[in-house]
Amino acid sequence: MFETFVNFFKTKEVRNKIFFTLAMLVIFKIGTYIPAPGVNPAAFDNNQGSQGVTDLLNTFGGGALKNFSIFAMGIMPYITASIVMQLLQMDIVPKFTEWAKQGDVGRKKLNNVTRYFAIILAFIQSIGMAFQFNNYLKGALIIDPSPMSYLLIAIVLTTGTAFLLWLGEQITQYGVGNGISIIIFAGILSTLPSSLIQFYQQAFVGQSDTTMAWLQVAGLVIGLVLLTMGAVYVLQAVRKIPIQYAKKQSTQRLGSNATYLPLKVNSAGVIPVIFAMAFFLLPRTLTMFFPKADWAQQIANTANPSSNIGMVIYIILIIAFTYFYAFVQVNPEKMSDNLKKQGSYVPGIRPGEQTKKYITKVLYRLTFVGSIFLAVIAILPILATKFMNLPQSIQVGGTSLLIVIGVAIETMKSLEAQVNQKEYKGFGGR
């Protein structure tokens, strides 16, 4: 592992990309400490803040929400917009469906619409969030709660979201990995120290008997190790479907019989968990404008994964999004057509429609295992806070762990591929 990291920095091109990414993340972190104009960040000092979805937003944003900084909205509006856009492509909006079939050209059009939609959503959510937090903090957040103040805050927070999207694009183009994922990854890691401090204060400070606290620590460490091992296994595990080439039957002894079609146990990665949590923001956005209404409070309680009903909805959403995104990532029909064009086939399965049905069947089974695993990982920390008296920040621990591991794995693969490509070019003399 250490040798792998050394190789990353030996390659000039990869090294420059790493340093560029780190520079962009420093800018991101600095922005989380710059408060929005007209707010009093100290209002949060003596309050625990909201829980559930809000805690996750704060974690994804690197603590920007609790500071009510210019990046307080983070990139969640973009994620929510992406969910809506992908759903609209399913023959709901014909034009979007048409673009989705146009390859790179159509994808660029959809990305542009998604960005515009994200900006509109960020503006609406930022106004609602300012109302909600100012009401929650009994008017202590907004220094001058006039319409112009709310408008200014909304413009600044929306601009912050737009800047983060631009920052993510720069990382994707000139840095390492997927920019949006890297920003979320960095945000989660940056809030880890404060979560540990909160746990220490709740478990040890002012306690005469720390036996239970040490048992909690032991349980957390064991749970963390097991969850990490399980996450790595499921995110990396693949089902190898053997394939053969019709024109190479005589060359099996040369290794053609070892050819296979890899299908991940969890083809969707950690996206379903992020999507499920972002989905909770849609009804909560409306309730932000009516913080004192009983019906709004009921919706807010339901749209919270820490509540009993919210937990059930959370599980259903994770499973549903896992299936949805798995078939976005893996297209059995296209895969079957490609095998047929290459003159290859799955032993015992007829090419064409039968192969498509077989791949679909295997993908359904694999996705079921992957979706259950994601749901369990996301729910276990929530249950732990309910029954083990752990800090509320632990609730998002499972989700955060999955994202950190998933992004780390994909980033490592990307770096290794770039290093190998550079070495190959050097060997071939270009």
From Swiss-Prot:
Native organism: Staphylococcus carnosus (strain TM300)
Subcellular location: Cell membrane
Membrane topology, as annotated: Multi-pass membrane protein
Transmembrane parts of this sequence: 18-38, 68-88, 117-137, 148-168, 179-199, 215-235, 270-290, 308-328, 368-388, 390-410
Stated family: Belongs to the SecY/SEC61-alpha family.
Protein name in the entry: Protein translocase subunit SecY
Subunit record text: Component of the Sec protein translocase complex. Heterotrimer consisting of SecY, SecE and SecG subunits. The heterotrimers can form oligomers, although 1 heterotrimer is thought to be able to translocate proteins. Interacts with the ribosome. Interacts with SecDF, and other proteins may be involved. Interacts with SecA.
Job description of the protein: The central subunit of the protein translocation channel SecYEG. Consists of two halves formed by TMs 1-5 and 6-10. These two domains form a lateral gate at the front which open onto the bilayer between TMs 2 and 7, and are clamped together by SecE at the back. The channel is closed by both a pore ring composed of hydrophobic SecY resides and a short helix (helix 2A) on the extracellular side of the membrane which forms a plug. The plug probably moves laterally to allow the channel to open. The ring and the pore may move independently.
NCBIfam families found in the cross-reference section: 3a0501s007
GO cellular component, one term: plasma membrane
HAMAP family documented for this protein: SecY
Gene name tied to this protein: secY
Main location: membrane
GO BP terms, alphabetized: intracellular protein transmembrane transport; protein targeting; protein transport by the Sec complex
InterPro entries cross-referenced by the UniProt entry: SecY (IPR026593), SecY/SEC61-alpha (IPR002208), SecY_CS (IPR030659), SecY_dom_sf (IPR023201)
Keywords: Cell membrane, Membrane, Protein transport, Translocation, Transmembrane, Transmembrane helix, Transport
Domain of life of the organism encoding this protein: Bacteria
PROSITE patterns xref list: SECY_1, SECY_2
